[in-house]
């Protein structure tokens, strides 16, 4: 469901720049509510047409919103990176690489000035140009992760395993528990970067120590 208006906090706001920085050492971050364009789907991202459709639609509408702002004299913003939330009904689907069972929400965070009305206009323009194949699945929504840990992975996506294991280990060592979907922020474009140079922030929302069941 799209919110009635803008939600405080987005990747377009300077005070959130820290959310898009990470190092090889896992660190805790406090993530405010973020307004996002989202498309939900399922299946192998490398072979499922719906995945490519989702990504193409997100970029088309996000850049359309930026150009609309520029056209009316507003200061344009930089379009944020592609992000993905990943989960499966059976968590073992990730351990066994059973990609057909993967579920995902691809998203791009939007500035606070973006409203549902603006999104509708940008989407209509993208549809008219044939650039929004996932138009019926696009929605403006709020991502509310709260406390999380994140780490930078450098290298191919299919080599993230040790980085994720290290992140989960750091979370457990500090008394937190995993909560919510696995979150990836793609700082590198696989179409333009060698696999070994891809940079991905891996974020995991957590449950506070005092809320973790004991014994």
How should these model regions be labeled?
Residues 1-215:
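A solvent-exposed interaction/effector surface
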């Amino acid at each position: 469901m799209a919110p009635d208006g803008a939600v405080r906090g987005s990747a377009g706001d300077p005070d959130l720049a820290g959310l898009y920085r990470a190092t090889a050492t896992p660190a805790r971050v406090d993530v405010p509510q973020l307004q996002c364009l989202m498309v939900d789907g399922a299946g192998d991202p490398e072979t499922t047409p719906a995945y490519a459709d989702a990504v193409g639609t997100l970029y088309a509408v996000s850049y359309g919103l930026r150009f609309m702002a520029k056209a009316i004299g507003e200061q344009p913003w930089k379009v944020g990176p592609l992000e993905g939330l990943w989960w499966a009904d059976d968590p073992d689907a990730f351990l066994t690489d059973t990609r057909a069972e993967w579920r995902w929400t691809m998203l791009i965070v939007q500035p606070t000035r973006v409203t549902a009305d603006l999104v509708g206009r940008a989407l209509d323009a993208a549809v008219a140009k044939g650039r929004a194949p996932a138009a019926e699945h696009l929605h403006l929504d709020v991502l509310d992760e709260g406390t999380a840990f994140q780490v930078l992975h450098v290298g191919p996506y299919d080599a993230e395993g040790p980085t994720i294991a290290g992140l989960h280990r750091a979370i457990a060592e500090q008394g937190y528990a995993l909560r919510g979907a696995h979150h990836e922020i793609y700082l590198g474009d696989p179409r333009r970067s060698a696999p070994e140079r891809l940079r991905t922030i891996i974020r995991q929302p957590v449950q506070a120590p005092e809320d973790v069941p004991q014994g």
